Regions:
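Long, charged/polar, surface-exposed segments that mediate recognition or autoinhibition
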Residues: 116-159
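Residue-level marker of intrinsically disordered, low-complexity segments enriched
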Residues: 43, 56-58, 104, 120, ...
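Short, recurring structural edge motifs at helix starts
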Residues: 58-66, 136-140, 178-179
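Short, composition-biased local secondary-structure segments
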Residues: 40-47, 109-121
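N-terminal, intrinsically disordered, polar/charged segments of Gram-positive cell-envelope systems
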Residues: 6-10, 15-16, 21-79
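A cross-family detector of function-defining hotspots
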Residues: 71-115, 146-207
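Positively charged n-region of N-terminal signal peptides that target proteins for export
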Residues: 1-4
Length: 207
């Protein structure tokens, strides 16, 4: 009888070890998958940040003077490579070229007139998780005339950005999707600056 109990106990012990090993192996696979996903996410964020830094290096020139002072097509291609799409538009003999780069979820659009940058735009970019400093109360406290630099210093760089220069007026429209306190994933704050001074602002679902 003792022999039967011993065999049974040994069998249960082996079964327990086997189940533990399976559980450990399953947990190990799950952890490995999570680590792989996080690594891929970190690489994407890193690549997007590098793209954003290159975007920031593009100089926008005066539209009324054929992009004077702006980066050339060659300058931009050195930073971003060859575009995915190009388009040329002519209005009253005034020619503009649109170059578009698609990098994952991020789209960079640069307009040349005819060979120097007159506008630049980046959409789909997000800085990733950061402190939610920009809530509805903070948004409402931002006054017309506040400088772009002051807003960035307080709330961080915007995610999307559009910049142009016309008749000496530099216009920047900046959107924040991260670093904000929102009701849902679609929440955002949009601020427009002229010559570094806030002229208008809108928000969607901040709280």
């Amino acid at each position: 009888m003792k022999k039967k109990y011993l065999v049974a106990a040994t069998g249960l012990a082996l079964l327990g070890l086997s189940m533990s090993a399976c559980s450990s192996n399953s947990g190990s696979k799950s952890d490995s998958a999570k680590t792989s996903q996080q690594k891929k996410k970190n690489e994407t964020i890193s690549q997007n940040k590098e793209l954003r830094e290159k975007f920031d290096q593009i100089k926008v020139g005066e539209l009324s003077n054929h992009g004077e002072g702006g980066s050339t097509i060659q300058d931009v291609e050195k930073l971003l490579g060859k575009p995915n799409t190009t388009d040329t538009t002519t209005v009253d003999s005034y020619k503009t070229k649109s170059y578009i780069w698609n990098k994952g979820a991020v789209t960079v659009t640069v307009q040349f007139a005819p060979d120097k940058v007159v506008t630049k735009d980046i959409t789909g970019f997000k800085w990733g998780k950061r402190d939610e400093k920009l809530d509805l109360a903070a948004f409402n406290s931002i006054q017309d005339g506040t400088s772009y630099d002051d807003v960035v210093k307080k709330y961080g760089e915007p995610d999307s950005l559009n910049e142009s220069l016309l008749l000496g007026t530099k216009t920047v429209t900046a959107l924040w999707y991260t670093g904000i306190k929102g009701k849902d994933a679609g929440a955002n704050a949009s601020l427009t600056f002229e010559n570094n001074s806030l002229t208008s602002k809108t928000q969607t679902d901040l709280k």
